[in-house]
């Protein structure tokens, strides 16, 4: 992936994507990972994410998914099918608008939950994140920084830290997710 960030670093423009090894990649989970309780489907084609999900045997797995605008625009039907199978969607505000057509973040969060995942986080970069869940909304600030050089990978780091904290807590209740979100923001 290559792209450029706009002046405020909150929005980006994708300039080029080279799939390279992912063009013919077929992920195979090792037997020891098939019963994982915490699963993060990283940003790859939704068909590959579904292929990973198909290999899981743990019925109580807490499954989070990440994506980018490329998959929303080029593989939207596959991504919408995948959303019916996951517990936790974490995307940024421009991706949420692209997926739902809603520019209002509150309406977008509700619309995303209707697509399947019970829990949704919409990231707003330097402006924090919004966590949507049944009968609730939780807004949290971003970790304050005075100088931002390059936000590439910040969302991946955030979600990885959130899922790592949930796995360490071995819980997925709302309070634990809120705690993990604060942790992810600080990382």
Model feature map: region roles:
Residues 1-40, 54-60:
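Conserved N-terminal subdomain of the carbohydrate kinase-like
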Residues 19-24, 67-73:
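Short gly/ser/thr-rich secondary-structure transition/capping motifs
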Residues 25, 48-49, 75, 105:
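Amphipathic coiled-coil/heptad-repeat helices and related helical stalk/stem segments
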Residues 29, 79, 148:
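Acidic, amphipathic alpha-helical patches
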Residues 43-48, 68-72:
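Short beta->alpha connector loops
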Residues 54-62, 69-141:
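Conserved phosphate/ATP/ADP-binding segment of small-molecule kinases
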Residues 105-187:
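Conserved phosphate-binding/catalytic region of the ribokinase-like
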């Amino acid at each position: 992936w290559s792209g450029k960030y706009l002046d405020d670093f909150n929005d980006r423009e994708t300039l080029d994507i080279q799939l390279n090894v992912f063009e013919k990649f077929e992920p195979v989970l090792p037997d020891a990972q098939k019963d994982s309780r915490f699963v993060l489907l990283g940003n790859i084609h939704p068909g590959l994410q579904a292929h990973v999900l198909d290999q899981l045997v743990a019925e109580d797995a807490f499954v989070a998914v990440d994506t980018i605008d490329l998959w929303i625009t080029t593989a939207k039907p596959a991504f919408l099918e995948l959303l019916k199978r996951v517990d936790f969607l974490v995307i940024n505000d421009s991706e949420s608008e692209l997926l739902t057509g809603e520019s209002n973040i509150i309406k977008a969060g509700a619309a995303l939950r209707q697509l399947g995942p019970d829990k949704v986080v919409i990231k707003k970069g330097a402006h924090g994140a919004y966590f949507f869940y049944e009968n609730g909304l939780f807004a949290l600030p971003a970790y304050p920084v005075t100088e931002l050089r390059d936000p590439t990978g910040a969302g991946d780091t955030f979600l990885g830290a959130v899922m790592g904290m949930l796995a360490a807590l071995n819980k997925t209740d709302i309070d634990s997710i809120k705690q993990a979100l604060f942790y992810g923001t600080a990382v």
